[in-house]
Amino acid sequence: METMMLAALPLLFLSSCFPAFVVAQGPADPRLTGTWTTKSMKVFTGSAFYDPIKDRLKEPLLTGISYSFTADGFYEEAYFRAISNPTRPECPSGIMQFQHGTYRVEPNGSMILTPFDSDGRQLISNRCAGKYAEYTRYTQKEVFQRYEILIDSYNRVERLNMFQFDGSPLNPMYLAFRQPQMHPTHTLNPTHTTKGAPRATAISERKVNAKRAKRSEEKAAEFGFAQSPLSKNSFVKRMNYYHSRMEKLSGTDKLWWVGLIMTSVGSLALIYR
């Protein structure tokens, strides 16, 4: 017994020197393996969408959705969506979301995606709301009622149809890479908490809050789109309908004002004739 315990000590020491890796739970579907993206073909998972070192989301040229899956039960997702504003068409909003974690396929055909808690990120951007976008942590477990993989009759490539928990479909995605384009399948930005640590005093709390505020300002300056929160080369293309509508409206307004002024000038000329 003592010999076995001594033999196990080096293994315990080595295991403490390396970070813990997550093992995917539940069955995976090898047919899902790869990177899938929607029709715009501009949104892909991986380093092109999220930089974990700088903790920064990178805005693609066009909106879209991308999912990647591995054969051993890991996934990653990238969302870039435009949201119209019916009351102010010139002020559309944009949402970017990044998550990764594990997935499993249930016996009934449903699929459950469980993200790593500390890694999800969300960016909400509104050109009319302020100087900077809102950048926060984001964690949302997803349940898909079912999914199907088939050959698209038009593009002749593999297509992935995913149906949300209520049966509503996501936009169809097409296989872009058989080798998944994604980050390492473990937590990228862990949050460290110490149990039993003494509570900070009021002074130290103020110092921490001041440092956090300074970091937030630095992060906003670096990442918060010092220029317009929504770039012209993505949302303007996506929201052409609303922009053209506003342009037509402004042109009509101008024409109306010009007509009113000319009518007024003509009336005055007749009066003083």
Curated annotation (Swiss-Prot):
Glycosylation sites: N108
Localisation per UniProt entry: Endoplasmic reticulum membrane
TM annotation in the entry: 251-271
Higher taxonomy: Eukaryota, Fungi, Dikarya, Ascomycota, Pezizomycotina
Family listed: Belongs to the ROT1 family.
Xref: Pfam families: Rot1
Keywords: Endoplasmic reticulum, Glycoprotein, Membrane, Signal, Transmembrane, Transmembrane helix
Protein name per the record: Protein ROT1
Record function comment: Required for normal levels of the cell wall 1,6-beta-glucan. Involved in a protein folding machinery chaperoning proteins acting in various physiological processes including cell wall synthesis and lysis of autophagic bodies.
One GO cellular component term noted in the UniProt record for this chain: endoplasmic reticulum membrane
One BP annotation, GO: 'de novo' protein folding
Transmembrane among keywords: yes
PANTHER family linked: PROTEIN ROT1
Membrane topology per record: Single-pass type I membrane protein
Record topological domains on the Lumenal side: 25-250
Signal peptide: 1-24
